[in-house]
Each structure stands twice: as structure tokens, then as C-alpha cells.
Amino acid sequence: MRRFEATKNSGLRMLCACLLLFMTGNRTMAEEQMDDLKKRTPMDLSFKQLWKRRFVFDAEIPFPKDVTFLPCGHFAADVTSLPAEIQLVTKSGDVKMCIEAPVDVQPPYTMHAAFGGKARVGLFVTKDGVTRLNKLVPLPDGFDPREKSYTTDLVMRGAGGAGDVKCSLSAGMGQADVRFVTRGRENTLYWEDGRIFFTFSVRACGAEGVASFDPAKLDVRLEGIILFDYGDGKLRNDVACHLFHDEEAGEWRAFVSNFSTGGDGLGNGLNGRAEGGLNSAWCKENPLHGLSVMKAKSLGLKGLMHEDPSGIWDPEAKKWRLFLCTFVKGIKAQMLESDNWDGPYEPLTEIVPEDSTGTTIQWMNGVRYCFFGSAEHALYVYSYPLLKKLGKLKLDVEPWGDTPLETPWGVMKTTNSRVWPCFAELPDGYPYKYILLTMDRINIPGMPNPNWTYGGLYIYGAN
């Protein structure tokens, strides 16, 4: 739908109010109608599903053949006969790792090796147009693919019946933990060339992805991948962040969940993650396109573990506010505050009673609201900043429950409702005034537990 057609739906009531004012001079009635629109809250909206899609190694940014190795890379090779393998070899000839092609699948097929930092390598097979997990390949002892030196010293090559290895940045086989990229310190949407941007967790590859779309076209495309540098010689695959362009500081900033520290022994947090669970990250150059690296450090949160941060500067309170999930009595939303963007942060509120995920602060009609998903089959809306419960978002088709969902592996269902509510208000001229981006929690069939392979994208609109 073209932008000038938007008045057919999104601006109809506002247009009628303006025409009434112009033709009749009845300011009272017109003003009342416009005031009613301004008084609406997120709970008054009825979201309609507009678009859904799960990318399965089909949203790629190819890298040239002379690129050697990326710790967030997707490596694919066509297998025509067995035995076959993908080898990781140093320029001096030292074989660091061999990823053998599955022998329980009859060639020809395409094998995919998806790296996720210091973790297992996901080995996937695409045959007859369907991609499935074949197995998880452990990394050899002493091999950490995040080492910066490997980006110039390692070569990926096919051996036996495997052809040339193609390297790409990828949206993976699932997309989750979605959050809009914002501009300034007060959480307004960031735009480039009529497109809005969002970050997401790349499933299988285990990295922070960036994608964009035109709200009038819903043409979602992969833009890039962000890695994080702690200054320890590694390029890390952290995920679940809030990225914003702080124009006042002259840099890009992010609040990031430090999942890459699991098993590193950097702290005593959940599953080995560094204490507090969150980092601050920053860079001068625009990190939205291609492969980017942001410097990062711990946010310094003490004691409890946290994730899913959403941060703003509140000019009235003269405080940075951080809305996040805290690991206490389960996982519950909480508001913290600080004088500085990179901490230290202290609690402003107690935790909410509901299970929480995807904590997000956003605007509607000049009022900030707090949103989060939940295991309780709801997308909750709370007040900002003191977290008083207001209600729930209404969706015509929920990405959980009894509604069958089409996937590359057939029609499936999931009862897991812990999805992220990525809410935003659009400017005039679009088919819908309000937009909601979220995901489902459908895992790839046959994936050993525990796993995080879920993530199909959904876009909703409301007026």
C-alpha cells in the first residue's frame, strides 16, 4: 500500500474531525473527537496481524571469498558425495577443526555450519528445500573461535565431496528478542531512508542481528551483525540489546545482555555469566550495516542476574532509567535508575508479580508506557516509571496457543507466550498509526534440550 493511501484507514477519524471543524465551524465537536484520540492508551488498540515470516538461512549478506573466518559466521557447502567435511585451517596449515558432513543423509544436499561464539557449532542440512538440524558439534579443547587473530588466520575450506565454502552474515534459522533501534535519549524511532530498524537475536548463529523495514511495505531485510569487544582479545556474540543513537554524546550506545560470558568464568552469575548479566556498549560509527564491533564493559550490577534491558534518559527526573528483567522469584520486570548511562544503577521499583520477558519502554500520545511479554499468555502494559499495572495488548491472532502456525517444518503450535512486545507509534502517512513487532517461540523439531532455536517474526498494525 502506498503511503498516500494511509487516510483510508489510519487517519480516518482524525480526518473526519478536521473536516467537521472546517465545514461546520463546530469546534467543540471536532476538538472532542481529536481529544478522544489523544486520550487513547495501548490497551484501547486492537492489533491486526499484517505479516509473518521465519527466515531459515535465506536472509544473508555474502562475504567475499578472500574473507577467512567470522566468529558469527554462517558457512555453507554443497555436498555431492561422502565422505565430506568443512575444515578450519590456519594459514600455516594447522587444522583447528573438522566438521564432518552427515552420513545419515543421502547427497546431494547443502550442509550449514553456524557458529555461536564459545559454544557448540550447529550443523544443519538443507535437502529438498527443507532445513533441519542434524547435530551439535562440540568445539575442540583449547579452540575458541572468538579470538580476534582467527579472523585473519583461519581459512574455511571444503574437503572430500564438499564444494567451496561460502561465508555470510546470516539472520540464521530463527529470529527472536526483537527491539526497535531508537534515536536520541528519549526512545523515539530511528529512521534511515524511510526505514525503521530493529535488533534481534540470530538463532543458531548466536549473534546480535540488525534488520529494517519500510512500515508501508513490510519488506523486512537483514542489514548487519554486531559483535562486542570487551578488550580481552575476543569478538563476542552477545544478544538481547537496546541499541540507540545518542546524538548528544556523539556516539551509538547499547544496553546488552552478556550471554557470551556463559562458561567463561568471568563471574558467579547464572550459568557462569558475568555478574549482573548486563553490559554497556558504544561506538562512533553507525553499527547498523554489515559487520560492526562495539566496545563493551560490565554495567556493574551487583548480586542478582538481569536481562532484556531497555534504557532511556528522563529529562524531568534527570536520571537514566533502565527497564529490565530481574532473576528473583523467577524472572520479573523491574525499573532501575542512575545518574550516568553506564551506571551504577539502583532499584527505583520492586519487581512486578508476573513472569516477564522483553521489557520495553515506548511512547504513545506523548506518554511513556512499559511493555513486557509473559508466560501468562499476555503482553502486559504498565505505567512508567513506577510500574503500576494498566492492562494488556489485544492481538487478533496471538503467536501462541491454539492458533496453528505455518513453519518450514509443517504446521505447528506452541503454548509458550514469552515473546517480546516491540511497540512503536508511527508518524502520519502510514497505513497504521501503531505497529507491533514480535516473535513466536517455536523450536526446530528434533533439537536437543535445552535449546534456543525459536523465532518467527510477526508484524501487527493498529489505528
Language model region names:
Residues 16-23:
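Bacterial N-terminal signal peptides
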Residues 1-11:
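N-terminal secretory signal peptides that target proteins for export/translocation
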Residues 26-29:
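Sec/Tat signal peptide C-region and signal peptidase I cleavage site
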Residues 31-463:
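Carbohydrate-active catalytic/glycan-binding domains of CAZyme proteins
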